[in-house]
């Protein structure tokens, strides 16, 4: 049984119309719980909130440097983008540099969130392609790593070297043994962990500057890339982009489906993970805003 707590309430005048339950965990640079609300031990699927972890092998393998990837591509490898031109143009160029095409993706087509792109497709009668998928940046990273490793085309399968590398990074950063996995909306495996484990992984990213190993240095590069390009991480009108801009490069925010959010706060050496029980984005957006802004202001540190 979950020990969730009320995190968000919606009121209409004097009447409370709905309440969203969930859990929040903040971990410090030792991986221990700094503060928590609800159930830190609940097992979740992080969904897209852990894309930074999945992108680590892209750098630690040498594939990123071998292909001359810059901050723009690294940010897109961690993105859940809107499918605006600001996202599609660099991913298209990235694919061309690899000598690959849309059909080499394994994420599947998806209608873009960006209204300009979506309306353009409707006007021209063109179907959405795989590049429009909000995870196509992550999959461009997978393709880059796969090409570097010389793996077979189905890089999304759980026993593929690309996914094995992502899984190893996941267990390393969460410091847990995963209990299983589900197939994410973009066809790649998404491994389970406790909410504390996910917060611990984010704290590992937040304190990466203190360490000299290759994985930690890769984490620093990913955090810096996301901070340098907040518009690429999600896009206009999205909580991640807006909150990262408001924080002025002092924190990384990453959304995941079904009410998951993560935050990396390097200055405080803190990592945050939250899960809304009913999976609603309106509640996870609001919760992330409150707890991240308070943690960034050291409110929890007094």
Features from the language model and the residues they span:
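C-terminal functional modules
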Residues: 279, 283-286, 293
């Amino acid at each position: 049984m979950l020990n969730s707590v009320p995190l968000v309430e919606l009121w209409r005048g004097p009447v409370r119309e709905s309440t969203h339950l969930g859990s929040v965990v903040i971990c410090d640079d030792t991986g221990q719980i700094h503060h928590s609300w609800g159930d830190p031990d609940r097992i979740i699927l992080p969904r897209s909130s852990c894309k930074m972890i999945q992108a680590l092998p892209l750098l630690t393998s040498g594939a990123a440097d071998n292909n001359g990837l810059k901050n723009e591509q690294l940010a897109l490898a961690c993105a859940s983008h809107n499918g605006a031109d600001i996202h599609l143009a660099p991913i298209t160029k990235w694919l061309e540099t690899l000598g690959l095409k849309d059909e080499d993706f394994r994420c599947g087509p998806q209608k873009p969130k960006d209204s300009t792109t979506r309306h353009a497709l409707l006007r021209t009668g063109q179907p959405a392609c795989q590049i429009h998928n909000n995870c196509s940046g992550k999959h461009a990273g997978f393709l880059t790593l796969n090409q570097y490793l010389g793996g077979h085309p189905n890089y999304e399968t759980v026993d593929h070297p690309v996914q094995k590398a992502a899984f190893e990074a996941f267990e390393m950063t969460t410091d847990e043994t995963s209990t299983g996995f589900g197939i994410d909306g973009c066809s790649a495996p998404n491994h389970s962990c406790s909410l504390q484990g996910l917060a611990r992984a984010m704290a590992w990213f937040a304190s990466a500057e203190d360490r000299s190993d290759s994985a930690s240095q890769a984490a620093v590069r990913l955090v810096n890339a996301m901070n340098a390009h907040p518009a690429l991480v999600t896009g206009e009108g999205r909580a991640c982009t807006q909150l990262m801009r408001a924080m002025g490069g002092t924190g990384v925010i990453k959304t995941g489906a079904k009410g998951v959010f993560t935050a990396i706060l390097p200055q405080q050496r803190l990592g945050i993970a939250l899960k809304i029980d009913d999976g609603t984005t309106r509640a996870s957006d609001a919760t992330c805003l409150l707890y991240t802004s308070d943690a960034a202001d050291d409110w929890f540190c007094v």
